[in-house]
């Protein structure tokens, strides 16, 4: 069984992660690879809550925010529709911006 790649770009805000994800995604697609690119926080309902907290500077306990990030990461990994594991099983190289 062929194993597919999961590639994560990590760094501080503004360090070029999204740019690198796009460049690598485009390059691999041009080479004929199936590629699924994603980011965290995700676009899921949980990810939207996280984004709103930071966008609107909503005060929240750091433990609550950490719990939301954990929940978003688990959904990102295990989601039966578009989760990382599902996409790897479908033969995609998965590239994420964290």
Regions found by a protein language model. Give the residues of each.
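Walker A (P-loop) phosphate-binding loop of P-loop NTPases
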Residues: 14
């Amino acid at each position: 069984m062929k194993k597919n790649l999961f590639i994560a770009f990590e760094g501080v805000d503004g360090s070029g992660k999204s740019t690198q994800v796009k460049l690598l995604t485009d390059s691999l697609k041009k080479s004929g690879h199936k590629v699924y690119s994603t980011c965290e926080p995700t676009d899921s309902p949980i990810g939207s809550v996280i984004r709103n907290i930071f966008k609107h500077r909503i005060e929240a306990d750091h433990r609550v925010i950490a719990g939301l990030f954990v929940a978003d990461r688990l959904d990102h990994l295990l989601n039966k529709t578009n989760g990382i594991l599902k996409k790897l099983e479908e033969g995609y190289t998965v590239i994420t911006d964290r």
